[in-house]
Swiss-Prot record:
Molecular function as annotated in GO: SH2 domain binding; transmembrane receptor protein tyrosine kinase adaptor activity
Modified positions (Phosphoserine) in chain numbering: 52, 63, 157, 226, 346
Protein name: Phosphoprotein associated with glycosphingolipid-enriched microdomains 1
Localization, UniProt: Cell membrane
Comp. bias intervals (Polar residues): 236-247, 331-347
CC annotations in GO: membrane raft; plasma membrane
Complex formation: Interacts with NHERF1/EBP50. In resting T-cells, part of a PAG1-NHERF1-MSN complex which is disrupted upon TCR activation. When phosphorylated, interacts with CSK. Identified in a complex with LYN and STAT3. Interacts with LYN.
Listed GO biological process terms: adaptive immune response; intracellular signal transduction; negative regulation of T cell activation; regulation of T cell activation
Keyword Lipoprotein: yes
Tissues where this protein is expressed: Ubiquitously expressed, with highest levels in developing brain, lung, thymus, spleen and testis. Present in mast cells.
Residues with a covalently attached lipid (S-palmitoyl cysteine): 39, 42
Residue intervals on the Cytoplasmic side: 39-424
Length: 424
């Protein structure tokens, strides 16, 4: 039993050793795989950390716009920024010819002097080179902005204005505003003209009747727009139009024209009779005053008229003189030389001459003694009555037919026909 038992025990020991060896091998395998997984995870963790660090470094590096965003007129250049504009070189950076050319171009742009910048602009502050895009124009919102724009237009740079771009913006906006306000539309001026001529339709109609084509020429002023270079913006134009409408209308409207000139001319015979009733000897002086005033008005309307034409145009008929030269049935004064002189001096009995005017005071002064033996105590009044009666008889001609009523003014055609006769 001894050797058999020892053999069994040795077989069991071998089985145990195989089992423990296999267990150890399996354990070692699992341990190695676990360590490999741990190492791979560590490698994976390290790789994203390196990439994130590179990304953060790239984001912290200033861009090209930030590197060259300083004022263009400053002469100082940043050497450090120009030398380190691309940042620190890393393994992933690739240098090419394009990148080097862009770096050199930026460096040359920084090295330009203020004299070159001033040469690139003309006297008005406008760049000579063509720009690809148009700068925005912001209208002034308050008085401070308006003062700044006016100062920039005059050439005085404000406290916060730097560089050529601000100057270009201000000059272009100012030019556009001035160009917008140079010309006014015809519609606006027609509206103003309608307002000014709304309450004066009667005066304009009388003006057209009296002046004719002259008034029509003045009425056409609303067809063209006026140009005012002193106005700098539409707001100032509107303000001036609102505030100065009354003054402009008063200045533009012509002086009032007397509308009742025709009525006065039609009523002149009645006024002449009343004047003769009050003071008969002073009638020629009153007529001469009236002639001088009318000739003055005609000279204003047409300065080319001469004194002779004006006097011929406004020569009137003295009715007391006509009746005084004609012998009446009730008057005792006989003037045998009156009718032949009148026929020789004028072509008919409707017109009076200078000789008749000169003789009218004598004839009128001779009438009152003729009526003194009468019944009425006022001989002057009776003499004027007889004159009026004789005036009523004047339209009846020698042949018995009616003569058209005479006018106070002679027509130009009759004057031209009878000029040689009246000068005798």
């Amino acid at each position: 039993m001894g050797p058999a038992g020892s053999a069994l025990s040795s077989g069991q020991m071998q089985m145990q050793m195989v089992l423990w060896g296999s267990l150890a091998a399996v354990a070692m395998f699992f341990l190695i795989t676990f360590l490999i997984l741990l190492c791979s995870s560590c490698d994976r963790d390290k790789k994203p950390r390196q990439h994130s660090g590179d990304h953060e470094s790239l984001m912290n590096v200033p861009s090209d716009k930030e590197m060259f965003s300083h004022s263009a007129t400053s002469l100082t250049t940043d050497a450090l920024a120009s030398s380190e504009q691309n940042g620190v070189l890393t393994n992933g950076d690739i240098l090419s010819e394009d990148s080097t050319m862009t770096c050199m171009q930026h460096y040359e742009e920084v090295q330009t002097s203020a004299s070159d910048l001033l040469d690139s602009q003309d006297s008005t502050g406008k760049a000579k080179c063509h720009q690809s895009r148009e700068l925005p124009r912001i209208p002034p919102e308050n008085a401070v902005d308006a003062m700044l724009t006016a100062r920039a237009a005059d050439g005085d740079s404000g406290p916060g204005v730097e560089g050529p771009y601000e100057v270009l913006k201000d000059s272009s906006s100012q030019e556009n505003m001035v160009e917008d306000c140079l010309y006014e539309t015809v519609k606006e001026i027609k509206e103003v003209a309608d307002k000014s001529q709304g309450g004066k339709s009667k005066s304009t109609s009388a003006l057209k009747e009296l002046q004719g084509a002259h008034a029509e020429g003045k009425a056409d002023f609303a067809e063209y727009a006026s140009v005012d270079r002193n106005k700098k913006c539409r707001h100032s134009t509107n303000a001036e139009s609102i505030l100065g409408t009354s003054s402009d209308l008063d200045e533009e409207t012509p002086p009032p024209v007397p509308v009742k000139l025709l009525d006065e001319n039609a009523n002149l015979p009645e006024k002449g009779e009343h004047g003769a009733e009050e003071q008969a000897p002073e009638a020629p002086s009153g007529h001469s005053k009236r002639f001088s005033s009318l000739s003055y008005k005609s000279r204003e309307e047409d300065p080319t008229l001469t004194e002779e034409e004006i006097s011929a145009m406004y020569s009137s008929v003295n009715k007391p003189g006509q009746s005084a030269h004609k012998p009446g049935p009730e008057s005792t004064c006989q003037c045998p030389q009156g009718p032949p002189q009148r026929s020789s001096s004028s072509c008919n009995d409707l017109y009076a001459t200078v000789k008749d005017f000169e003789k009218t005071p004598n004839s009128i002064s001779m009438l009152p003694p003729a009526r003194r033996p009468g019944e009425e105590p006022e001989p002057d009044y009776e003499a004027i009555q007889t004159l009026n009666r004789e005036d009523d008889k004047v339209p009846l001609g020698t042949n018995g037919h009616l003569v058209p009523k005479e006018n106070d003014y002679e027509s130009i055609g009759d004057l031209q026909q009878g000029r040689d006769v009246t000068r005798l």
